[in-house]
């Protein structure tokens, strides 16, 4: 299932997700609301193992961060086996040595969720081309722990 969003979210096919540009304000909670709807309508956690993956530039309307955190912790993560968030830097954005890009408000919101012990993995990449390799790493089968 592919969900894209700006200030509104919608489920789209894979080709549209990857190749149809969208612009506009960013309200992340709309995508989480859409994921909640898809889970409720078609993928009950009683019948499916649900894995979520989110890639973002980190932009979110600041007034939406609290709602995003609440949806993630109260609805999305309890329905998922695993959830990964990947934040992509802006292409061509460079910082002098010793300077780093400030954590986005969305990154800080999700970091609070991780700090609470939630099953959420977070990574940053510098380029869109790095998205799939990092998602592959995050979702690779982990060796079983010794009992």
Language-model segments: residues:
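A short, acidic, amphipathic alpha-helical segment used as a generic capping/interface helix at domain edges
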Residues: 35-42, 64-74
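Conserved nucleotide-binding/hydrolysis micro-motifs of P-loop NTPases
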Residues: 7-9, 59-60, 90-93
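DG-centered beta-turn motif at the end of beta-strands
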Residues: 49-64, 88
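Von Willebrand factor
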Residues: 1-52, 59, 86-88
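A short acidic (Asp/Glu
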Residues: 11-16, 62-66, 95-97
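Von Willebrand factor type A / integrin I
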Residues: 71-147
